[in-house]
Amino acid sequence: MKHYSFLLILFMALCLSLGNGNKAQAGSLQTKGVWVSCFEFEELGLKDKTEAQFRANANKIFATIRANGCNTVYFHVRAYDDAIYPSSVAGFSKYISSDGKAPGYDPLKILVSLAHSHKLKIHAWMNPYRVSSTKILDPASEMTTARIVNQVKEIINRYAVDGIHFDDYFYPTVDEG
């Protein structure tokens, strides 16, 4: 088994070293991204802020991301069947507003505008099934699929995001392994 693992690693290294010979194209398509999790919103100065404070702090975040050589940001817009934007499908995220009520401005609209002003692509990062630490939406349910599709449509019809990113399929479990 070790022999096969070594051969596989050697083969992958060889393939990666060959490249495609078109460095200009490869460089222009390279993605250097960072994920901004809802669990970091408070520390980053995005939670329970006025619009001006939110905008100033988001601007600093994007300036830092760009200064560190990144060109893409994956921003957590839906973590627990909630939304960081006004939604007809989901409640407002407690990670932006402690009371779960809209703050009187549209955080995602601001984020998209500021990201693009820093020449960053911004992807809406969603956890499609997670409702809480112990509850998930039923992945086999047509109602769940319709709910997720409606949330994606809501985002792509209202915001100039550069992509939708589904991630972190957390399922309740009692087994840590």
Q: What are these model-derived regions, one by one?
A:
Residues 29-32, 68-73, 116-123, 159-163, ...:
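Loop/turn elements at helix/coil->beta-strand transitions in domains of secreted/extracellular proteins
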Residues 28-56, 108, 112-113, 122-159:
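Active-site-adjacent "subsite" loops/lids of carbohydrate-active enzymes
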Residues 1-6:
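Positively charged n-region of N-terminal signal peptides that target proteins for export
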Residues 7-17:
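Bacterial N-terminal signal peptides
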